[in-house]
Amino acid sequence: MANNHSDRRVVVTGLGVVTPVGNDLNTFWQNLVAGQCGIDKILSFDASAFATQIAGEVKNFDPTPAFPSPKEIRRTDRYSQFGIYAAWSALQDSGL
């Protein structure tokens, strides 16, 4: 039983980002347009034991606005925080 979903429509109501070139839409877009590169020497830990010491790290990330309490932030791993913050930002951007 195959479903053809090509006739389904999607409405994008808001955008949210957490990236190496910006953690909010304005910063992200300005850095993207300016050709800013998010790849740099790894600063979040000592990478000298690894073959590669460069990466696209998310810097200056503060998940606080997207979480109800500091306890919830502590319970959530960093990468889930990125997703939750991006979804929260998209909701804020949507104006819903």
Go through each PLM region and give its residues.
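Conserved "HGTGT" condensation-loop signature of ketosynthase/thiolase-family condensing enzymes
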Residues: 1-96
